[in-house]
Structure formats: C-alpha cells, structure tokens
C-alpha cells in the first residue's frame, strides 16, 4: 500500500504513541523520517532512534519517546507543509514556534534542520512541521 504523506504518518504515530504512554514507536523507515527523528533527538524531544531490518528485508525505524514526570516531552507536533500545499519560506521568513520555545523543522538544500540552524546557515526551505 502506498503512503500519500509519510511525514504526516511519522508525526501522527509519534503523537498517538505519546498520548497513550507508549515507550517506543515502530514504523517503516525512510531517509527523511530518519533525518526528522535525528533532529528531534538532537533537540531533546526523543530519547533514541534505531534503524533495523525486518525478516523480509524492510528497514524499520524505532523511536524511543521521552517523558518528564510522567508526561510526554512533545506536547505539540503539527504538520505545516503538506503534499497538497507546500509551504516554502525564505531565510528571513522562517517561523519562530512559541516565541522560540519550540522548533520548526525545515527541509533545506543543506539537509533537514531546525529553524534556528537554518537562520544561522542563511538558508530557507520547506517548513515541514512544528514541535513544542
């Protein structure tokens, strides 16, 4: 079965798993999903990520969620740019999430990074999602 929006699938799986208190999330892996998960790990929103091979040679991404005092660290996870309406922003138009308390994940020509890293690198790109 083909997936229309794999990034939205990743975000929804993380959001649903955190809502019910699961420790890990397993989903089909891709380069962009691993890159987004790596940004979440670098920013402290998740504990760990692993890419493993299943029996039928498919790559599987396992994300270990992070909790603080019994509550998920990720409170808000929202897809911004979507397959039907891509949202591109220049380096001066990159959004700040919750006045700088959250992050926006941006797909740039230099890879996937946070809004702060994109501003520092002086590049714009597609605003994939918001995390807070």
Curated annotation (Swiss-Prot):
A Gene Ontology biological process term: translation
Short name of one Pfam family: Ribosomal_S8
A GO molecular-function annotation: rRNA binding
Protein name according to UniProt: Small ribosomal subunit protein uS8
Organism from which the protein derives: Xanthomonas euvesicatoria pv. vesicatoria (strain 85-10)
Family: Belongs to the universal ribosomal protein uS8 family.
Key word Ligase present: no
Keywords for this protein: Ribonucleoprotein, Ribosomal protein, RNA-binding, rRNA-binding
Described purpose of this protein according to its UniProt entry: One of the primary rRNA binding proteins, it binds directly to 16S rRNA central domain where it helps coordinate assembly of the platform of the 30S subunit.
Quaternary data: Part of the 30S ribosomal subunit. Contacts proteins S5 and S12.
Organism lineage string: Bacteria, Pseudomonadati, Pseudomonadota, Gammaproteobacteria, Lysobacterales
Gene Ontology CC terms, in alphabetical order: ribonucleoprotein complex; ribosome
HAMAP family referenced in this protein's UniProt entry, alphabetically: Ribosomal_uS8_B
Keyword Isomerase among UniProt keywords: no
